[in-house]
Amino acid sequence: MLKKFFLTAIIFCMLTGIAQAADKPQKKSVWQPELRIGILSGVTQVGLKVSAPCIMIDAVTKKTLKKIPAEKNFAVDFAQMKTTAVEIRPEKIPLKDLIATIDGRKYFGGVRVNKVKGSLTVINLVPTEEYLRGVVGEEMSPAYPLEALKAQAVAARSFALKNRERHDKEGFDLCPTTHCQVYEGFEDFEIVNKAVDETRGEVLTFKEKIADTNFHADSGGMTEAVADVWGTNVAYLVPVKELLELTAPWTMKFSAKDFSSRFGDNFGDVKSIKLSTLTIGKSANDRTSSGRVKSAQLVGTKKTLTISGIDLRRKFSLPSTLFDMKLSGDEVIFTGYGRGHGVGMSQQGAKTFAEKNWTYDKILSHYYSGTKLKKLY
């Protein structure tokens, strides 16, 4: 009888324990992709400091080379480095909680230093979510509405993971400039952190693959087809209209002499410019479907040139290719709208939509047609 009582009690305790375990909230996934951001290159020495005790590892053999104390300045010197690459990682805390100072600037995460052709390349080893804390507030103003910042967080996360080996030949994933995404390392904007945290692990996908979510400052009224900028057709990067048109107006003037000199002696002096008038969303032989300049004809005293809008933008450092241009007396005048290449999400447009109470997922679906929002981790 006593045995039966104990057996019953044991079974009851086991079942109760299982039930209680099932009732406990499951711990959120802490895993996230680690990114390699190229910070410095072509240097022979780099000054470093870490916020917590770390170990320096031979990146090839994985052997511990030495321990690094917290908050003590130290340097990695090319001449004294006996291996091709070292990594500095936290001894006890998660990588995301470490702050590394590289040449005076703070970054989330650890550090890798590679020997490359007589100099050092310095790389920030940073978890994706911490990387975004240093990107979102640089690519978009922290003064923008939360839903716009959340859209930016998803776009930046998707772009980073889609293009994470863009600089693989140089030994890292992404650079910290507009070539990839502007990254300033450690930043602590409350609203940016909220935007990142509330979209943790979310990316845009198209046909089960992460989308290449290009974005820009201001479309001027309508975004551009990626095929008209980089020559590749992408189903979700097509022109879409904004709530507002003719935004971010700009004017740039050049003397006719200066203008002509940019095309070489064989061009002579500019006599006339042939380009149809800009209308947002109206295509022409010399304009794309959004109204951006596809090409313009420049008539010189010695030669007539046909030049693309992209080349004109590059040659004269124009804010965008959404412009009119004319020869007026001894001046060439560009009058345009928008800032940036025009592909994908307009950051100013996202702000305007958010101010009209659009949620971040609705903003993203507007700019990236046919994509799906997916929680990757």
Question: Which sequence ranges carry the predicted segments?
Answer:
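Conserved, single-site charged/polar hotspot
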Residues: 2-377
